[in-house]
């Protein structure tokens, strides 16, 4: 007798699921712009690859600093207020690009990106665990992969539209404040919507008591081996994924394969592979275990990075593009596996996991290596990151048996 497959989300949670999923699109857009900004600022401000890496360092430092405070805020005031506050910080960071563009000072842009990164931290800390709770635990990973697919859509739209705008040859192109002002206005409108809508608060019914507050919860988390392993794997993934995205345009243009404008379009195509991987992963994981899918994809990423490092022309480019398909399911899959069976520790765990985008600072190391004259060698860093994910995938598959 066949068991009936549980629905992706319960009917009563459908509206909250749709609303929260819009946030995934927003931060996908905001984070993908960074990958275009690197080359834009190198061209406009005459800075090196390593110097431009401070775009990622300041943005993702916001995640590292604000993840725990964001979790404490959400624990006390709830998911909805956490989302609204995050959106307001997001908008403020976007509008700070206006004085940055006026003064053409890299440091002002970095301050704006730090504030924006703090806002994104609130959104991701609230939205990722919230989506996993909007339905059956059996479909949590699939549900999060579906929401994260819209993150991929935001990334595609960002690299395509902003890339075309910033790399235009006429005098109107290149004003980086314009897309950020538009983004800030959209974010404020969405913040208004969330301030008027009541989101159901999800209260786990099982787990440890919260005696001792947030610090006590953190101490309990680090006594859970599978959570600690998931945290390490997620950090390694972020090092790999963000570094590849940030270096993509520099790599393909440095190899002489294409111009900046064409490179931003090819990056858009790569992110389309990423989105297809997310949607496909959501479908596959309703039929195949998340652990097994993660293992296959980790192997695919390691092989893809090896193809890039072999430096065999168009085959290396194909390997780089295919990697986007394989890496697509990693963040939501590792995230949901790390949160499994944590009960009332889920919010605290989410805060800790949302510190992992600080791995984006790894692009600084890639930039330093690239500035040394070898454009291929920097890919050793993402290869190492995916190797850690592969080890984690092997471990969770063995634990499942």
What residue ranges belong to the model's regions?
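Intracellular juxtamembrane helix-capping segments at the cytosolic ends
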Residues: 122-136, 328-343
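Central cavity-lining transmembrane alpha-helices of secondary-active solute carriers
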Residues: 54-72, 268-280
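Extracytoplasmic
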Residues: 15-45, 127-128, 244-249
């Amino acid at each position: 007798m066949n068991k009936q497959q549980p629905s992706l989300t319960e009917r009563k949670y459908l509206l909250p699921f749709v609303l929260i999923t819009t946030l995934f699109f927003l931060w996908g857009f905001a984070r993908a712009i960074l990958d275009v900004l690197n080359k834009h600022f190198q061209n406009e401000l005459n800075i090196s690859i390593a110097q431009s890496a401070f775009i990622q360092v300041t943005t993702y430092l916001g995640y590292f600093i604000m993840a725990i405070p964001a979790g404490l805020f959400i624990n006390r005031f709830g998911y909805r207020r956490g989302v609204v506050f995050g959106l307001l910080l997001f908008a403020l960071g976007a509008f700070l690009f206006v004085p940055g563009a006026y003064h053409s000072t890299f440091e002002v842009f970095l301050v704006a990106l730090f504030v924006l990164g703090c806002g994104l931290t609130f959104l991701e800390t609230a939205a990722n665990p919230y989506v996993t709770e909007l339905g059956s635990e059996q479909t949590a990973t699939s549900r999060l992969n579906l929401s994260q697919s819209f993150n991929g859509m935001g990334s595609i739209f960002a690299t395509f539209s902003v890339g075309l705008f910033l790399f235009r040859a006429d005098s109107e192109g290149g004003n980086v404040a314009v897309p950020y002002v538009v983004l800030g206005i959209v974010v404020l409108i969405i913040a208004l919507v969330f301030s008027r809508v009541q989101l159901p608060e999800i209260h786990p019914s099982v787990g440890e008591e919260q005696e001792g507050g947030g610090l006590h919860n953190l101490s309990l988390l680090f006594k859970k081996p599978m959570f600690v392993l998931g945290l390490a794997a997620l950090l390694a993934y972020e090092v790999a994924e963000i570094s590849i995205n940030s270096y993509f345009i520099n790599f393909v243009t440095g190899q002489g394969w294409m111009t900046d404008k064409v490179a931003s379009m090819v990056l858009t195509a790569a992110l389309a592979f990423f989105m297809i991987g997310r949607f496909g992963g959501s479908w596959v994981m309703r039929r195949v275990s998340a652990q097994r899918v993660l293992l296959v994809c980790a192997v695919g990423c390691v092989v893809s990075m090896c193809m890039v490092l072999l430096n065999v022309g168009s085959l290396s480019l194909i390997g780089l593009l295919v990697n986007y398909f394989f890496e697509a399911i990693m963040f939501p899959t590792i995230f949901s596996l790390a949160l499994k069976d944590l009960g009332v520790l889920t919010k605290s765990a989410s805060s800790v996991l949302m510190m992992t985008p600080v791995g984006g600072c790894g692009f600084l190391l890639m930039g330093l290596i690239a500035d040394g004259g070898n454009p291929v060698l920097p890919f050793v860093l993402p290869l190492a990151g995916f190797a850690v994910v592969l080890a984690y995938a092997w471990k969770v598959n063995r634990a499942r048996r």
